[in-house]
UniProtKB/Swiss-Prot annotation:
<keyword id="KW-0560">Oxidoreductase</keyword>
<keyword id="KW-0288">FMN</keyword>
<keyword id="KW-0285">Flavoprotein</keyword>
<comment type="subunit">
    <text>Homodimer.</text>
</comment>
<dbReference type="InterPro" id="IPR050104">
    <property type="entry name" value="FMN-dep_NADH:Q_OxRdtase_AzoR1"/>
</dbReference>
<comment type="function">
    <text>Quinone reductase that provides resistance to thiol-specific stress caused by electrophilic quinones.</text>
</comment>
<dbReference type="GO" id="GO:0016655">
    <property type="term" value="F:oxidoreductase activity, acting on NAD(P)H, quinone or similar compound as acceptor"/>
</dbReference>
<feature type="binding site">
    <location>
        <begin position="17"/>
        <end position="19"/>
    </location>
    <ligand>
        <name>FMN</name>
    </ligand>
</feature>
<dbReference type="GO" id="GO:0016652">
    <property type="term" value="F:oxidoreductase activity, acting on NAD(P)H as acceptor"/>
</dbReference>
<dbReference type="GO" id="GO:0010181">
    <property type="term" value="F:FMN binding"/>
</dbReference>
<dbReference type="InterPro" id="IPR023048">
    <property type="entry name" value="NADH:quinone_OxRdtase_FMN_depd"/>
</dbReference>
<comment type="function">
    <text>Also exhibits azoreductase activity. Catalyzes the reductive cleavage of the azo bond in aromatic azo compounds to the corresponding amines.</text>
</comment>
<dbReference type="InterPro" id="IPR003680">
    <property type="entry name" value="Flavodoxin_fold"/>
</dbReference>
<dbReference type="InterPro" id="IPR029039">
    <property type="entry name" value="Flavoprotein-like_sf"/>
</dbReference>
<dbReference type="GO" id="GO:0009055">
    <property type="term" value="F:electron transfer activity"/>
</dbReference>
<keyword id="KW-0520">NAD</keyword>
<protein>
    <recommendedName>
        <fullName>FMN-dependent NADH:quinone oxidoreductase</fullName>
        <ecNumber>1.6.5.-</ecNumber>
        <ecNumber>1.7.1.17</ecNumber>
    </recommendedName>
</protein>
Length: 211
């Protein structure tokens, strides 16, 4: 039995979102073809995700100096504990599905905050004499990303930073088996938006069977 962590980063309702609609189609098909697997849904806009702030840096610093967790301030304890909880949840999964829109050539800021909680030295990667080494080997990920324009090819290709950044981070922590479903062109070709979504849904369903 595999554990799937389904991560969404979109404040919209599912029926209003291209990425969430495609993501839901993927998830329901996955459940049908992998009924024994455990699926955990994490919606970052409905979840407490601490930002890396002064309390977090202060708490980490005290722990590195040998202070007990109980000696941290209340805010430091709460934020550090929550970050550890999110990181542990991520580490326990075998497969990951990220569902995001493209905002200003990248993804929503709440996802960046979440990514900061899963990139922890000693947990998801470690430093060695040869450089950093990712510790999450043998796992796989899928990124479903909605883009209003066309970014897979053409002059705007180099302006797509969300999928490329996510792939870089996942590779850094050891996850190199990553696929992407790009739902793109809905704003550039509004008359074709529904057809674009349906094509992406069919691709997502097909991928769910073998993911």
């Amino acid at each position: 039995m595999a554990k799937v962590l389904y991560i969404t980063a979109n404040p919209k309702q599912e029926q209003q979102s291209f990425s969430l609609s495609v993501g839901r189609a993927f998830l329901e098909t996955y459940k049908q073809h992998h009924p024994e697997d455990e699926i955990v849904e994490l919606h970052v806009y409905d979840t407490d995700i601490p930002y890396i702030d002064a309390d977090v840096f202060s708490g980490w610093g005290k722990l590195q100096q040998g202070q007990a967790f109980e000696q941290l301030s209340k805010d430091e304890q709460q934020k550090v504990a929550r970050i550890n909880e999110l990181c542990e949840q991520f580490m326990e999964a075998d497969k990951y599905v990220f569902v995001t829109p493209m905002w200003n050539f990248s993804f929503p800021p709440k996802l960046k905050a979440y990514i900061d909680t899963i990139c922890l030295a000693g947990k998801t990667f470690q430093y060695t004499e040869e450089g950093p080494v990712g510790l999450l080997k043998g796992k796989k990920a899928l990124h479903i990303q909605a883009r209003g324009g066309m970014y897979s090819e053409g002059p705007a290709k180099e302006m797509e930073f969300g999928d490329r950044y996510l792939r870089a981070v996942l590779s850094f922590i050891g996850i190199t088996d990553v696929e992407t479903i790009a739902v793109e062109g809905m704003n550039a070709f509004p008359n074709e938006a529904e057809a674009i979504k349906q094509q992406a849904i069919e691709r997502a369903k097909d991928m769910a069977k073998r993911f």
